Amino acid sequence: FLSKNTLPNFPSFIEATHHGPTALKSPVLFAEIGSTDTEYANQDAGELMARCLLEVCKEWKYKRKAVDADRVAIGFGGTHYCQKFTKLMLDSNFEFPYIFSKYGLPEANSLTIRQAIEKSLEPVEIALIEKKSMNAQTRDQLIASLKEVGLNYEMV
């Protein structure tokens, strides 16, 4: 949806997960428009966000799919605003139900990774690791956790 519906001078990014996995039993989607009063007051951005959220809800209601993506992945690494994962989502048709940013990697153990997989609406196929955003020790610990839960991975 976002690849075909943009606003001039108003970039769209996906954000790293910072609210879960949660204990909620229903699907959860967090969305926000910017981080200042200027963005919050942008009516065009609000309308685009509303259309985007309605599209996601329609996909789920009628197709029982969260999105129409080719591949579903959990992302690991990067910053709060996930530019690399946003590009993969838009250019390669990936879906990211969870992204553990660089600052969230200490919580990315086998338990939380398993929860992220189980609580995703679509079956998670692979983990994508932003290699340059973490040191070798962190990457090795992450890979060990991914192997423990049986999730294949690729470096991006």
Where are these regions (language model features)?
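Well-ordered, non-membrane alpha-helical segments in soluble/globular domains
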Residues: 46-50, 110-114, 139-141
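A short, contiguous, amphipathic alpha-helix enriched in charged residues
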Residues: 1-7
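Short, solvent-exposed amphipathic alpha-helical segments in soluble enzyme
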Residues: 47-48, 90-92, 142-148
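Active-site-adjacent mobile loop/cap segments within catalytic or ligand-binding domains
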Residues: 13-60
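Acidic, Ser/Thr-rich low-complexity intrinsically disordered segments
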Residues: 65-136
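C-terminal functional modules of predominantly eukaryotic multidomain proteins
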Residues: 130-156
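Short acidic/glycine-rich loop or secondary-structure boundary segments that cap or lie
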Residues: 21-22, 39-40, 82-85, 137
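Short, surface-exposed recognition loops or helix-turn segments adjacent to catalytic cores
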Residues: 7-21, 61-75
